[in-house]
Amino acid sequence: PELERYMLHRLHTVLGDVRGHFDAYHFHKGYRALYEFCGTELSNFYFDARKDVLYCDAADSELRTACISVLVQIFRGLVTHLAPLMPFTTDEAWRERYGDEACVHMEVFQNVPGAEVDAAQWQNLLALRDRVNMELEKLRAAGGIGANTEAEVVIDADLPVELVREVCGVSHVSKGEALQVAKHGGHKCPRCWRYYGKLEQSGICLRCDEAVATTKAA
């Protein structure tokens, strides 16, 4: 998936920068780079965009599996690079993940191969996300919506609408002449909280219906 490729690209870049800082004995700069990556790009962006997939997709869905694979690489990369700075915390995290016999301080720095991404598209996409978030905040302040999932968005950019929907956390995105945000006029799925034009007979959306059926079959 495009979002996972982008996060692997960013992880590869950040970890490379951190090792460069460590090699120059600028440990405070390495820590700062990791701190900003965790706060801005993981917590405020990737985790926010993908929590819906982790919570609501079928356990074996391709998208959820890809997301978990990226999370594993993020964990290994962050913990090994934080180990010189936070030896006890990273040791505890590593043993919790891999068992009491494992020791992060016996590991080398974990890196990931760089993934090719369309840099111009991502620059435009992140700029659009900022614009959408500003409009969503205005709508929220006016009492129009609560969560972003209550909104639908019309974009004025030539970008993949599903990718825009994912990174903005809204229920529907379409293309138009100008950027517009509004409360979605459809039905709320009580399982994933996204809005749709119609729900299934089970009272939930098609995606959730299929995920529940898969869980019951297992």
Report the location of each language-model feature.
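Acidic, turn-prone loop/beta-hairpin segments
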Residues: 1-20, 47-142, 146-152, 178-180, ...
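Short helix-adjacent coil turns
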Residues: 22-29
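Hydrophobic residues within the alpha-helices of tandem HEAT/HEAT-like
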Residues: 38-39
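A broadly conserved sequence feature marking short terminus-proximal activation segments
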Residues: 140-187
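Processing junctions and N-termini across compartments
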Residues: 183-186, 198-202
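Short cysteine-rich clusters marking metal-coordination/redox-active sites
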Residues: 189-192, 205-208
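Cys/His-rich microdomains that often coordinate metals
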Residues: 196-199, 209-212
